[in-house]
């Protein structure tokens, strides 16, 4: 098989200048009266020198239509003139929508008199040019409508038309008169005197909310102001860090030789695109390398963007960074209010926040002076959006770092096979940390045979005894089971009936808190039956174990020890996860029962035993990535053990202890298994040695989805043949779960060792679907570089 064709200097095979070949213009159908439309190439559109007052604005609007819409400018011209990146409010059918100007020109496909005018220009200055470039690149690469891409990439309040400007707060300080030893007018106002004394102790001032939190009132503040003893000044919520001020709040930690070597390699090229993979065992001090790289970047007056996989990691990362740095550090994630998110976005765009930390969507945060991008746990599947705009934040971080010409650092104890292939080929620099910061080596996976063994809550007696010994020694235990609920399903032992979802090809999960049956695919809920719906028997029993059942079993076995369950159900309330982790970090003996939420980067220094209830789920799955992902999860959860003063131990229960992949992982480690998986992928012609795109079709009508799938495959194969493209078209075939949410799902796979050809075929397929009337009655999406086949 020929090797893939990444362009020179790229990471995953795409350059910031990469432009897929688009198919010929297609009949787009009738144009809505009042504005013209042009095919949206998502960044491929040229923007000729604009006239001082353009007659036509090409505007991207949040819609599924892959085109720009032409409008006439409104009468009021923005202060800087009309230019790409300005947000505008426009009439669209019977609605008013917020769009973004992409083109300024003099011509349109419709007579200018037929074009609707823009209602309002919402910005005095355009949104950042680099942000607009990133959105256009994203739309082009992922074959997604530019208008919707822009919509998804900006905070909710900007989508609604809110101005992009810094919110301010009052900061109170004593006046020169208030600094006198015995200021007048306070003899009969003791609370005002106390307030003034508190302000004197804070020469840089105090915010209003901080003052009110100390039981003072706004009336007392106004009284001091009226007496000329205190005054307030307005400042941005995120105050800028001034060059020359101390950068660090606490000194950096000393580095071991491996950390120092990695940091020196990163310092070599701080002014250039420099992709590096930092492969470090769990607990090896990758975060300290991040911190010292950021210190160098911010010290040069630039900004750093740090991406973490899940919201659960953001509080601890944020706390660690704020503890180290005196500069503003802002966070962006889904747990923020709309105002908080806009404040952080604006602080980053203005440059007042030198450090930005966030989850997947934070990749779209504009930076005034970009200096470095860091992706922690780069292998994590959470970086891939699984609906709508199906982008991968890690891959876009590569493109963004290349565009800015800045260092990119991807860190992981279990790197993705895509990243490993790039590092081992020499496209990226490969940095390694093989030693833990503690004196103990990472714990080896000990396989425990489940065959023929009696279980309680999924645990066999020898494992329960090891848990008891660990707790008696005063340590903590993490029990990992990647299935929430009480049991995977409910079954009748008289007739074999199973609780199945009416809307999905899946079994319903039994929950005890509250008691119900729930489908984890469509969220359908059902009350627990008193008797079997099939035969009327009352012999209904749970099958298997979930987090709730294991929690219940452990609470009964160890009543004197707290049991903390951490899964999506138990952490729905804001800060619930962080409160549990705070309690666990106190060090008292306890049991943690959780899903993969616990496996991702959390520092649990008092955990010395990790138990994996069942390691078999990914061994024989239909998805070719399942083995890689299962191995990553096992190694990550194992890495929670023995991170401090005591060595760790990891027990992995399995029914397949003789599986060659599992044995290689336990005996030789992740790197050895990754080598084997890469060879298997190469032989099979799978990523990272080939590129994929997946067309997903779904409809409540099975015949509709099957008919369109067949037509699409036939049209695509004909189109590929006419252009002699080296692209394979596989399918259509039913999805692994054919019926989900009462809709039938069908898939068509495109595969090629030439990314440019894959994109050309994908663009042709999208054009055919948009021009085909039957496709309007079926929901469809094209997933570039799919991470799951479900």
Go through the PLM ranges and name each one.
Residues 103-105, 154, 234-236, 481-483, ...:
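A general secondary-structure junction signal
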Residues 707, 741, 760-761:
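Short conserved micro-motifs at the rims of enzyme active sites and ligand-binding pockets
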């Amino acid at each position: 098989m020929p090797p893939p064709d990444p362009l020179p200097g790229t990471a995953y095979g795409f350059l910031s200048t990469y432009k897929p070949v688009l198919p010929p213009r297609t009949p787009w159908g009738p144009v809505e009266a009042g504005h013209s439309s042009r095919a949206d190439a998502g960044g491929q559109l040229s923007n000729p020198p604009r006239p001082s007052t353009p007659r036509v604005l090409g505007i991207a609007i949040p819609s599924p239509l892959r085109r720009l819409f032409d409008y006439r400018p409104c009468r009021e011209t923005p202060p800087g003139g009309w230019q790409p990146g300005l947000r505008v409010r426009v009439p669209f059918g019977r609605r008013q929508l917020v769009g973004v100007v992409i083109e300024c020109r003099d011509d349109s496909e419709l007579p200018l008199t037929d074009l609707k005018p823009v209602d309002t220009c919402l910005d005095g200055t355009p949104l950042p040019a680099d942000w607009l470039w990133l959105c256009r690149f994203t739309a082009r690469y992922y074959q997604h409508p530019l208008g919707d891409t822009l919509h998804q990439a900006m905070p909710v309040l900007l989508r609604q038309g809110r101005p992009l400007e810094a919110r301010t707060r009052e900061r109170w300080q004593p006046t020169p008169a208030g600094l006198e030893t015995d200021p007048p007018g306070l003899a009969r106002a003791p609370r005002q005197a106390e307030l003034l004394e508190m302000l004197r102790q804070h020469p840089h001032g105090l915010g209003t909310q901080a003052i009110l939190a100390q039981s003072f009132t706004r009336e007392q503040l106004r009284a001091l102001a009226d007496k000329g003893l205190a005054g307030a000044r307005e400042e941005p919520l995120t105050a800028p860090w001034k060059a020359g001020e101390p950068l660090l709040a606490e000194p950096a930690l000393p580095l071991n030789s491996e950390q120092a070597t990695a940091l020196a390699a990163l310092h070599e090229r701080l002014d250039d695109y420099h992709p590096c993979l930092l492969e470090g065992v769990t607990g090896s001090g990758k975060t300290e390398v991040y911190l010292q790289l950021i210190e160098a970047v911010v010290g040069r007056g630039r900004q750093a963007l740090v991406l973490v996989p899940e919201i659960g990691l953001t509080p601890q990362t944020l706390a660690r960074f704020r503890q180290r740095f005196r500069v503003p550090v802002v966070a962006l994630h889904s747990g923020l209010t709309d105002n908080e998110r806009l404040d952080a976005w604006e602080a980053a765009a203005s440059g007042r926040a030198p450090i930005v930390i966030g989850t997947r969507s934070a990749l779209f945060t504009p930076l005034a002076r970009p200096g470095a991008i860091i992706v922690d746990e780069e292998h994590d599947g959470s970086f891939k959006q699984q609906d709508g705009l199906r982008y991968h934040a890690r891959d876009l971080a590569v493109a963004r770092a290349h565009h800015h010409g800045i260092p990119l650092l991807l860190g992981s104890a279990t790197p993705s096979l895509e990243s490993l292939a790039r590092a081992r080929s020499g496209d990226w620099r490969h940095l390694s940390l093989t030693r833990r910061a503690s004196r103990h080596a990472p714990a080896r996976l000990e396989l425990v045979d489940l065959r023929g063994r009696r279980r309680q809550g999924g645990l066999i007696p020898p494992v329960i005894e090891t848990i008891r010994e660990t707790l008696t020694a005063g340590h903590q235990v993490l029990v990992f089971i990647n299935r929430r609920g009480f049991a995977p399903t409910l079954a009748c032992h008289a007739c074999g009936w199973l609780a199945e979802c009416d809307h999905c090809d899946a079994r319903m999960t039994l929950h005890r808190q509250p008691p119900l049956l729930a489908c984890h695919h469509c969220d359908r809920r059902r009350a627990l039956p008193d008797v079997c719906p099939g035969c009327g028997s009352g012999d209904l029993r749970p099958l298997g174990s979930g987090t709730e059942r294991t929690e219940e079993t452990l609470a009964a076995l160890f009543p004197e020890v707290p049991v903390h369950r951490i899964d999506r159900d138990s952490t729905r309330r804001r800060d619930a996860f962080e409160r549990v982790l705070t309690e666990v970090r106190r060090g008292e003996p306890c049991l943690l029962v959780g899903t993969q939420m616990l496996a991702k980067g959390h520092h649990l220094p008092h955990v010395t035993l990790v138990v994996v209830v069942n390691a078999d789920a990914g061994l024989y799955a239909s998805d070719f990535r399942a083995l890689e992902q299962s191995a990553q999860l096992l190694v990550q959860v194992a890495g929670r053990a023995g991170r401090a003063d005591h060595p760790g131990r990891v027990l992995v229960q399995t029914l397949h202890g003789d599986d060659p992949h599992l044995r290689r992982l336990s005996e030789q480690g992740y790197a050895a298994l990754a080598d084997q998986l890469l060879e298997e992928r190469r032989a099979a012609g799978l990523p990272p040695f080939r590129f994929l795109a997946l067309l997903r079709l779904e409809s409540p009508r099975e015949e509709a989805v099957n008919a369109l799938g067949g037509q699409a495959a036939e049209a695509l194969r004909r189109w590929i043949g006419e252009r002699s493209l080296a692209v394979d078209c596989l399918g259509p075939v039913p999805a692994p779960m054919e019926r989900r949410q009462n809709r039938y799902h069908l898939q068509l796979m495109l595969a090629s060792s030439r990314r440019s050809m894959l994109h050309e075929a994908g663009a042709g397929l999208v054009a055919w679907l948009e021009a085909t009337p039957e496709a309007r009655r079926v929901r469809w999406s094209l997933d570039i570089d799919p991470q799951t086949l479900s």
